[in-house]
């Protein structure tokens, strides 16, 4: 059997254990705009990179942060068209769960549901894997903050901070180096700092959502993001000066 057949067939493993179509879907994620999630003590922050819109395009029509339920929010990296299908299924499941159980679904339940759909599309004929990864965030009924990540293979896992999309490895390393279980203000600043590692400065390129327990999801406006970017840039300059001063003293 030629290698080309493994390349085309979604349900056939290559001799060395690869499902190439799943790996190609993951590559589509790596080419998508970056998204980060940070879980604080009593807050969760989602930050996403926004693509520049055409001059005549309405920027308000392009949203990468989506509300699934009163307490659950999702963002993604990868193919936007694929995300619409998954988001639609997740919204329907949230509504169905409320009608059936008469309670809101947990963040883990919805994460597992989305991952289950992604997994089924890796072993079914006539379909292809979803070319997106998702970050799903929200609070459980006991007030516990949750951040889950899913990928095209159908796996899902819980994180304190995570990054998906382009340069997610370097952004993830930055989060790993700088993350602490911190206050709301520091969590928001960490998400902005992580995005600014690879995103050009400016409110037009960044979207931030703040999720608090039993409160409406808040999308920061351009003025608030501008202030945050200015504060983060100023802190980076101070840090550079301190490092420069320390080197000179040595």
From Swiss-Prot:
Q: Could you tell me which Gene3D superfamilies the record lists for this protein?
A: Glutamine Phosphoribosylpyrophosphate, subunit 1, domain 1 (3.60.20.10)
Q: Where in the cell is it found?
A: Cytoplasm; Nucleus
Offer one example of a GO biological process linked to this entry.
proteasomal protein catabolic process
InterPro entries of this UniProt entry? Ntn_hydrolases_N, Proteasome_alpha, Proteasome_alpha-type, Proteasome_asu_N, Proteasome_sua/b
Q: Which cysteines are joined by disulfide bonds?
A: none
What highest taxon heads this organism's lineage?
Eukaryota
Choose one Gene Ontology CC annotation of this protein and give it.
nucleus
Q: Which family does it belong to?
A: Belongs to the peptidase T1A family.
Quaternary assembly: The 26S proteasome consists of a 20S proteasome core and two 19S regulatory subunits. The 20S proteasome core is composed of 28 subunits that are arranged in four stacked rings, resulting in a barrel-shaped structure. The two end rings are each formed by seven alpha subunits, and the two central rings are each formed by seven beta subunits. The catalytic chamber with the active sites is on the inside of the barrel.
Say what the protein does: The proteasome is a multicatalytic proteinase complex which is characterized by its ability to cleave peptides with Arg, Phe, Tyr, Leu, and Glu adjacent to the leaving group at neutral or slightly basic pH. The proteasome has an ATP-dependent proteolytic activity.
For this protein, the record's NCBIfam families field holds: PRK03996.1
Q: Tell me what this protein is called.
A: Proteasome subunit alpha type-7
């Amino acid at each position: 059997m030629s290698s080309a057949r493994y390349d085309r067939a979604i349900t056939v493993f290559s001799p060395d254990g690869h499902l190439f179509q799943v790996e190609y879907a993951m590559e589509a994620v790596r080419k998508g705009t970056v998204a980060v999630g940070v879980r604080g003590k009593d807050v969760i922050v989602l930050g996403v990179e926004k693509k520049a819109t055409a001059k005549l395009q309405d920027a308000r029509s392009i949203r990468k942060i989506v509300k699934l339920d009163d307490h659950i929010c999702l963002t993604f990296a990868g193919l936007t068209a694929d995300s619409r299908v998954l988001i639609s299924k997740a919204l329907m499941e949230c509504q169905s769960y409320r009608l059936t159980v008469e309670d809101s679904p947990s963040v883990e339940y919805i994460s597992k549901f989305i991952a289950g759909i992604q997994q089924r599309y890796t072993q079914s004929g006539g379909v292809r894997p979803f070319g997106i990864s998702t970050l799903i965030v929200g609070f459980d009924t006991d007030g516990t903050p949750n951040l889950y990540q899913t990928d095209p293979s159908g796996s899902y896992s819980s994180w304190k901070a995570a990054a998906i999309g382009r340069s997610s490895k370097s952004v993830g390393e930055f989060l790993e180096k700088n993350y602490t279980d911190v206050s709301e203000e520091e969590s928001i600043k960490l998400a902005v700092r992580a995005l600014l590692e690879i995103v050009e400065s400016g409110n037009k390129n960044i979207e931030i959502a703040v999720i608090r327990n039993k409160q409406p999801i808040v999308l920061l406006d351009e003025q608030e993001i501008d202030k945050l970017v200015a504060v983060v840039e100023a802190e980076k300059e101070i840090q550079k000066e301190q490092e420069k001063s320390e080197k000179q003293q040595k």
